[in-house]
């Protein structure tokens, strides 16, 4: 959930809806324009976080599971929140490789003071041993810029195996 400057609260539902709570009451209609996610197990629409400059740019970030039954992954998108809808939805990160499990996505989002975004990536349960493999996103925390680019001061930036 994320608290808006006006006191409203944005809440994600695993089933795929982004909801608004206003004055301690659920707004009847979900936010429109939310990208489709694949719901099951621990997957669906998972986290929401406001851009550090939300008051001036109205940008939010969502984490969601996407794909089909046999090939799913974690995706992070950013969009402009208009009060009841999302516009200009853009993918900023997609975990690799895909997996066939519906659990252990991670999917938590947090901004650092330098406005880079941290994204937790779960181990996919059946793939937990791959968390030690720097060539996958399993079991990692990824740091990206607000538009999804890799910051020049990221660790392992020039390591070809990563």
Could you say what each language-model-derived stretch is?
Residues 97, 102, 153-162:
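Short, surface-exposed recognition loops and adjoining beta-strand edges that mediate ligand/DNA contacts
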């Amino acid at each position: 959930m994320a608290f808006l400057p006006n006191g409203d609260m944005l809440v994600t539902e695993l089933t795929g809806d982004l909801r608004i709570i206003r004055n301690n009451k659920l707004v009847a209609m979900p936010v429109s324009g939310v990208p489709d996610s694949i719901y099951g197990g621990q997957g669906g629409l998972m986290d929401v976080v406001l851009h550090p400059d939300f008051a001036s740019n109205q940008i939010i970030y969502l984490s969601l599971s996407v794909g089909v039954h046999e090939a799913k992954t974690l995706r992070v998108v950013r969009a402009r929140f208009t009060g009841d809808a999302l516009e200009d939805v853009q993918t900023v990160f997609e975990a690799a490789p895909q997996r066939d499990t519906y659990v252990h996505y991670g999917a938590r989002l947090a901004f650092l003071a330098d406005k880079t975004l941290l994204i937790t990536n779960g181990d996919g349960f059946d793939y937990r041993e791959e968390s030690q493999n720097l060539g996958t996103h399993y079991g990692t925390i990824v740091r990206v810029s607000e538009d999804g680019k890799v910051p020049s001061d990221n660790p392992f930036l020039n390591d070809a195996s990563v």
